From Swiss-Prot:
The lineage of its organism: Bacteria, Bacillati, Actinomycetota, Actinomycetes, Kitasatosporales. The keyword 4Fe-4S applies. It comes from Streptomyces avermitilis (strain ATCC 31267 / DSM 46492 / JCM 5070 / NBRC 14893 / NCIMB 12804 / NRRL 8165 / MA-4680). This is 3-isopropylmalate dehydratase large subunit. One of its GO terms (biological process) is L-leucine biosynthetic process. Binds 1 [4Fe-4S] cluster per subunit.
Length: 477
């Protein structure tokens, strides 16, 4: 019987297999940041152990970093302590670190791919749930806890139970204005935030194959929001073109050998998945969340659902609580929801294609009165590229704030936060209660919807801008 993509990569990394025990996997790339690594380094220090494979370990500062005045001392004592601790630990153990101000600093899941460290057929771990991002390359990538971070630092291996596999097939053409973010939000709404629990998801089909690498990273990034262990997409010519010439990509004969191996990394025709989901791309439209988990979403053209419409009692209760927290009423058109803040950034949508898409919409327009728009590149390198293209000027002229790279408003661990009761349209990945600041209300959207929302002041798509322009044009003009 054939094997799935996930099974092939998993099997290639088994160091030890014994009946009744988890498989022991070799880890090819270990990514670190300041939040989940301090206790792991403490464990090494207490045991007198070194980092086993410094060549496979890299750290960056992202969660706590400010996005303004990065040349000044960090004001928040907790953030400052975590960053200083990471610097101390990396210096003591010899771990490569990209600190604030370094050209390669940024959100860890943006930095890995842009350096060419993330490659097909590898195993990638990080003490961060959105490590699934790297699965876009055909890598087996998943988030781990702090004790597991220590285990990998000490042994470069990890004992893991083998997950099941789920195929999510998306065929057809995505309609104009529908993005990878809309697609993954629709998938999560379809299968639920627990639908992928215990599975590695493989995204496949003609619609997936047509996506750019950055769009594929958006898809795999939010696999965890569906409850999955990881998400993967088989590597292809798009993958190879993205990697070729990057700092850590193979070269010459090694490149040829790598590509030959990478081409074998696809599910066999007779491979059997434990579950399958089929999505028609043509039926999709811009998507937004209305509630307090990523599965509580709907097409932008819809209205806030009535909790009474849910047959399942737990879903009905969750919807009631979500509407109460979000300050919404059943039947309210999603397009009528006004926002205070728009955030474009994060490891989900902070790459150069995302910034280009948002800039194309706000160019020649102004951010609505009373709305704050934050543009935060996913890495310093992305920021430099955006500046070279003049995107920073486009955003500033529209009235948006141009910031330095970092996790920023994705989570309330740095100065970029919502005030209680404030509402955001955010290109990040989680809309939990208080995720962007205590009492903050978050709607997850694509960069295109975020930009249109910033201009109109309420949840909107780029098509709404065209409709408004048409409505303002005098007859006969």
């Amino acid at each position: 019987m054939g094997r799935t993509l996930a099974e092939k990569v998993w099997d290639d990394h088994v160091v030890r297999r014994a009946e009744g025990e988890p498989d022991l996997l070799f880890i090819d790339l270990h990514l670190l940041h300041e939040v989940t690594s301090p206790q792991a380094f403490d464990g090494l220090r207490q045991a007198g152990r070194p980092v086993r494979r410094l060549d496979l370990t890299i750290a960056t500062e992202d969660h706590n970093t400010p996005t303004l005045d990065i040349d000044k001392p960090i004001a928040d004592p907790v953030s400052r302590a975590q960053l200083e601790t990471l610097r101390k630990n990396c210096a003591e153990f010899g771990v490569r670190l990209h600190s604030l101000g370094d050209v390669e600093q940024g959100v860890v899941h943006v930095v890995g791919p842009q350096l060419g460290l993330t490659q097909p057929g590898t195993t990638v771990v990080c003490g961060d749930s959105h490590t699934s991002t790297h699965g876009a390359f055909g890598a087996l990538a998943f988030g781990i806890g702090t004790s597991q971070v220590e285990h990998v630092l000490a042994t470069q291996t990890l004992p893991l139970a083998r997950p099941k596999t789920m195929a999510i097939t998306v065929d057809g053409e995505l309609p104009d204005g529908v993005t990878a973010k809309d697609l993954i939000l629709a998938i999560i709404a379809r299968i639920g935030t627990g639908g992928g629990q215990g599975y590695i998801l493989e995204y496949r089909g003609s619609a997936i194959e047509k996506l750019s690498m950055e769009a594929r990273m958006t898809i795999c990034n939010m696999s965890i929001e569906a409850g999955a262990r990881a998400g993967m997409i088989a590597p292809d010519e798009t993958t190879f073109a993205y990697l070729k010439g990057r700092a850590h990509a193979p070269e010459g004969e090694e490149w040829d050998a790598a590509v030959a191996y990478w081409k074998t990394l696809k599910s066999d025709e007779d491979a059997e998945f434990d579950a399958e989901v089929v999505i028609a791309a043509a039926a999709l439209s811009p998507f937004v969340t209305w509630g307090t988990n990523p599965g509580q979403g709907a097409p932008l053209s819809a209205s806030v659902p009535d909790p009474a419409s849910y047959e399942d009692a737990s879903e009905r209760f969750a919807a009631e609580k979500a509407l109460e927290y979000m300050g919404l009423t059943a039947g309210q058109p999603l397009r009528d929801i006004k926002v205070d803040t728009v955030f474009v950034g994060s490891c989900t949508n902070g790459r150069i294609e995302d910034l280009r898409a948002a800039a194309a919409i706000v160019e020649g327009r102004k951010v609505a009165d009373g709305v704050r728009m934050l543009i935060v590149p996913g890495s310093a390198r992305v920021g430099l590229q955006a500046v070279s293209e003049g995107l920073d000027v486009v955003f500033k002229e529209a009235g948006a704030e141009w910031r330095h790279a970092g996790c920023s408003m994705c989570l309330g661990m740095n100065p970029d936060q919502l005030a209680p009761g404030e509402r955001s349209a955010s290109t990040s990945n989680r809309n939990f209660e208080g995720r962007q600041g205590k009492g903050g209300r978050t709607h997850l959207v694509s960069p295109q919807v975020a930009a249109a929302t910033a201009v109109l002041g309420h949840l909107a798509s780029p098509a709404d801008l065209a409709d408004e322009n048409a409505a303002r044009t005098p007859a006969g003009v």
